[in-house]
Amino acid sequence: MLMLSTGAPGPIVLNKNKPLIAIVDDDASVCRALRRLVRSLAMDAETFTTGQQFLDLLDAMPSFQPDCLVLDVQMPGMNGLEVQERLARGKHSMPVIFITAHDEIGTREKAVAAGALAFLRKPFNDELLIKTVREALKRKSNG
């Protein structure tokens, strides 16, 4: 286990024995709910309220390599599609699951075309999200 202090709300604790799920959503209550859900599955979760905060940590802390990213589409500043585009251009590779309250025409298609594993509408069914996260982890482990 590795514990590092970053600009995030608290220290980031990395446990290489558990899958790490990164959650990016500007709604703190969604972040808390998703973190509880992920941790109930014996996985680690780190939450971020902006895409820039998440990307900055990826760049600043090479050991921070999430196994999956749950990413809100509509956020102030950098939206989820922009985060995904930056990931695709950079050296970081991870399955991306989009969540959104606004299923605008074309957004789902853009996300999937850019490589998103799934696109779930809020409020999402916990079981569907769990199944989708497990599928993402399975795909990542199979290369």
PLM features: what roles do these ranges have?
Residues 106, 124-134:
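C-terminal output helix
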